[in-house]
């Protein structure tokens, strides 16, 4: 019995001993709470705090609510005494600390520590303890009451209610700054903890199994020798090759994109090779073309291919039906005045005018003339044969090219071996002639020829023939160190036929010689006052102009043409359009081969080579030769007058300009008539 009693006693003692040990090892609830709070305060510093947001903006309140929840806080939708902090964006929230009702607002952390450390927390949940009331006089109480009435915070507002309940008021800027600071601290803690964990994983990474696989060739793989980084790879369809022809900034492994021509050739070669394999028959590759789908309003159905639909029976029956025969009959009666389609009309080729860029001819063109000569054109009619010579001064005319026939002028200049020879106009008896002939063909061709000078005599012939001047001859034409003064005077006389009427009437009374502007081109043709051009009416409708020089021409005149060292000057031919105005001449009983004593003198002016602009050409045409020139009116075209003569007086300029403009193409130049 004793033994059993001993067992029971020991068992009871053992149990009691275990209970004592358990009581010693079991921690109290208060100690558990105090141990867990510091850990939570590190990770979530706003744990156990209740907030109320007094913010008008929904987005700001949602963002702030999310940050508070991340830090362990809680947001309530209704304001009550259980709320720890009120967050507002009003100005009064900043000045709540300066008010006499409450003490300065502590931070949430300090408020939390105050709650935990205070042994006797207040009943309203706030750590604020009202100071002991001091007995004040009646006057001071009235003053404080007046101050309270004029307080910044209005009564019956959220802030005033929070102050009355003892809720801490925080401005939104303060809570934002506090949240940012806590986020930085948490980020540093997490970073340090992850680094420690990564170190532990690296130690045990060798034991972990990794997924392995085989790469298909060809591939490129890059591995790290230290095995700190995992390898990366790239699988390719074809092994790349280096392109040496590519430029420097580009990668040498970039493949040049084949052009469309190369693709076509590759397709053709492939077709040929396939054809050779199958007994020489070419196999056409079926290329998939996108079919144009649409809707036919005539057949009221959709189609996938237009051509197949047009060839279908349903569409052909609709097109060939007689339902619209009435409309076709009405349309056929209408007048066809439609414009031809561009594809149907043949394209007209544009006429190309060859305007060559002539090389400049280096020359000192003219001598410095000491005197400015004026040449007068005398208008002679049959009534004025016995009167004195009348002159018409300084008139410039521009005649339009209305005739279809082309009149071309040829200026042929040949080298003169002797530099001391002088160009002189002599009489017909002395075999020096200057003749103008007009053939009875469709085109009246005028050519001016300068022949080489003889030792004693010089010849100047105006021959009518058709020649052309090439651009190569113009480029070779260079006049170096020559000074040329072409002198001549053209006299125009009118001859009529006998009363027999065997000779037909001439259609021409006036000959307009093409010329270039002396001012621009500096090419002066000065005719002497005594030589003349004689216009003769012949039975073969030839217009012959002969230049005669009187016997009393002095051998040495100041106006002479000196040609020096002109071996390099080839014969030049220029086409010019000349307008000839032909009038009706009455048959009068005058002797043939009769010559009027009165002769008209005029000067031929050179034509502008290329008109740069229509405005400039007009200005050049209507520009007078002298500053003080006067316009004396147009000459009258009477039936009795044989020839209409106009005076053009040009001023000679002392210049050393180029001679290129003298040989210009006729397609672009306009003729300035007399």
UniProtKB/Swiss-Prot annotation:
Consequence the record notes for mutating residue 631 to A: Loss of interaction with PSIP1
The keyword Zinc-finger belongs to this UniProt entry's keyword annotation: yes
Disulfide-bond pairs as recorded: none
PTM notes: Phosphorylation increases its interaction with PSIP1.
Domain of life (superkingdom): Eukaryota
UniProt feature, compositional bias: Polar residues: 113-130
Region ranges (Disordered): 1-40, 100-131
Motif (Integrase domain-binding motif 1 (IBM1)): 614-638
Motif (Integrase domain-binding motif 2 (IBM2)): 655-674
Modified residues (Phosphothreonine): 273, 345, 553
Protein name, per record: Protein DBF4 homolog A
Species, as recorded: Homo sapiens
Gene: DBF4
């Amino acid at each position: 019995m004793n033994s059993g009693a001993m067992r029971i006693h020991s068992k009871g003692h053992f149990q009691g001993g275990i209970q004592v040990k358990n009581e010693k090892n079991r921690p109290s609830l208060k100690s558990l709470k105090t141990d867990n709070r510091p850990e939570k305060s590190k990770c979530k510093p706003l744990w156990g705090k209740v907030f109320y947001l007094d913010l008008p903006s929904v987005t700001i309140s949602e963002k702030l609510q999310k940050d508070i929840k991340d830090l362990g806080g809680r947001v309530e939708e209704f304001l009550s005494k259980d709320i720890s902090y009120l967050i507002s964006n009003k100005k009064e929230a900043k000045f709540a600390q300066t008010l006499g009702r409450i003490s300065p607002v502590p931070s949430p952390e300090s408020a939390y520590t105050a709650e935990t450390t205070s042994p006797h927390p207040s009943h309203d949940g706030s750590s604020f303890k009202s100071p002991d009331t001091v007995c004040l006089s009646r006057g001071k109480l009235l003053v404080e009451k007046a101050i309270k009435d004029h307080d910044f915070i209005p009564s019956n507002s959220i802030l005033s209610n929070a102050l009355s309940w003892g809720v801490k008021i925080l401005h939104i800027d303060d809570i934002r700054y506090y949240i940012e600071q806590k986020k930085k601290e948490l980020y540093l803690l997490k970073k340090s903890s992850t680094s420690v964990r990564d170190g532990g994983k690296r130690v045990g990474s060798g034991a972990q199994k990794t997924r392995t696989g085989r790469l298909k060739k060809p591939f490129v793989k890059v591995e790290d020798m230290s095995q700190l980084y995992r390898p990366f790879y790239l699988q390719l369809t074809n092994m790349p090759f280096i392109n040496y022809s590519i430029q420097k900034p580009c990668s040498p492994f970039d493949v040049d994109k084949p052009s469309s021509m190369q693709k076509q050739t590759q397709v053709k070669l492939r077709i040929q090779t396939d054809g050779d394999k199958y007994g020489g028959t070419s196999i056409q590759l079926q290329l998939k073309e996108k079919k144009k789908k649409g809707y036919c309003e005539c057949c009221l159905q959709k189609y996938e291919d237009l051509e197949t639909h047009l060839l279908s029976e349903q569409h052909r029956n609709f097109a060939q039906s007689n339902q619209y025969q009435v409309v076709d009959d009405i349309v056929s009666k209408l007048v066809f005045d439609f414009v031809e389609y561009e594809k149907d009309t043949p394209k007209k080729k544009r006429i190309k005018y060859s305007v060559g860029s002539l090389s400049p001819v280096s020359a000192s063109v003219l001598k410095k003339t000491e005197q400015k000569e004026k040449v007068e054109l005398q208008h002679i009619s049959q009534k004025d044969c016995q009167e004195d010579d009348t002159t018409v001064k300084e008139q410039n005319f521009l005649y339009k090219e209305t005739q279809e026939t082309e009149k071309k002028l040829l200026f042929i200049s040949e080298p003169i071996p002797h530099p001391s020879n002088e160009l002189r106009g002599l009489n017909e008896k002395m075999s020096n002639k200057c003749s103008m002939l007009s053939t009875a063909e469709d085109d009246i061709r005028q050519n001016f020829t300068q022949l080489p000078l003889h030792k004693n005599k010089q010849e100047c012939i105006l021959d009518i023939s058709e020649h052309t001047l090439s651009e190569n001859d113009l480029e070779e034409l260079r006049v170096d160190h020559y000074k040329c003064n072409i002198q001549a005077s053209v006299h125009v006389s009118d001859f009529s036929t006998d009363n027999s009427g065997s000779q037909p009437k001439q259609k021409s009374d006036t000959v307009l010689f093409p010329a270039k502007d002396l001012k621009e081109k500096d090419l002066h043709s000065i005719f002497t006052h005594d030589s003349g051009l004689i216009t003769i009416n012949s039975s073969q409708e030839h217009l012959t102009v002969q230049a005669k020089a009187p016997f009393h021409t002095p051998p040495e005149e100041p106006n002479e043409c000196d040609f020096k060292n002109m071996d390099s000057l080839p014969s030049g031919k220029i086409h010019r359009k000349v307008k000839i105005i032909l009038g009706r001449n009455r048959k009068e009983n005058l002797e043939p081969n009769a010559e009027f004593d009165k002769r008209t003198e005029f000067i031929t002016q050179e034509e502008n080579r290329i008109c740069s602009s229509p405005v400039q050409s007009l200005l050049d045409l209507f520009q007078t030769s002298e500053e003080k020139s006067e316009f004396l009116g147009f000459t009258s075209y009477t039936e009795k007058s044989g020839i209409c003569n106009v005076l053009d007086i040009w001023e000679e300029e002392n210049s050393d300009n180029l001679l290129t403009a003298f040989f210009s193409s006729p397609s672009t130049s306009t003729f300035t008539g007399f």
